[in-house]
Amino acid sequence: MIKPYTISTQMWLEHEDDNLGLNGSFVDFRVNVDSIDGYWVESPEEIVLIIRGTAYYIENEAPILHFLSEFFNPMRL
């Protein structure tokens, strides 16, 4: 596989205490892909990729785990 590949995607981020999933928003992030280790088709509109790589929050180039630690307890990630 020729590197690097970059995938831009979105993730639904909700607050830790929100069990209904109504209080959140989509977050754009970029993944620098090292390898695609597998995939499966959920539906014609949704394909799930198993990716090995590094994810970055698009708005400030921070690693995605650093960004997520602002919303969640890092010990639970």
Regions found by a protein language model. Give the residues of each.
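Acidic, Ser/Thr- and proline-rich intrinsically disordered linker/docking segments
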Residues: 1-31, 35-77
